[in-house]
């Protein structure tokens, strides 16, 4: 029974991340510039991206930050 509960929680978590990713947009032509406060946080967090295109390109973000959008650097990123 407890494994079933853990399984259900995991399914809900995956669904939440998926729906969060669908709310964003991919910026190809005109990448959205992050506000200066977020840029500073990105640089200090080893992800020196200044816009969403840099972050999504993998130059600064990783799978875990850009695709799951846990990091402020990937705030506007979406998986391609």
UniProtKB/Swiss-Prot annotation:
Q: Pfam families this protein is in? A: Toxin_21
Gene Ontology terms for molecular function: toxin activity
Cysteine pairs forming cystine bridges in this chain are 42-56, 49-60, 55-77, 66-73
The Gene Ontology CC terms held by the record are:
extracellular region
Q: Which UniProt keywords apply?
A: Cleavage on pair of basic residues, Disulfide bond, Knottin, Secreted, Signal, Toxin
Q: What does this protein do?
A: Causes paralysis to insect larvae (H.virescens). This toxin is active only on insects.
**Protein's name in the database:** U1-nemetoxin-Csp1a
UniProt source species: Calisoga sp. (Spider)
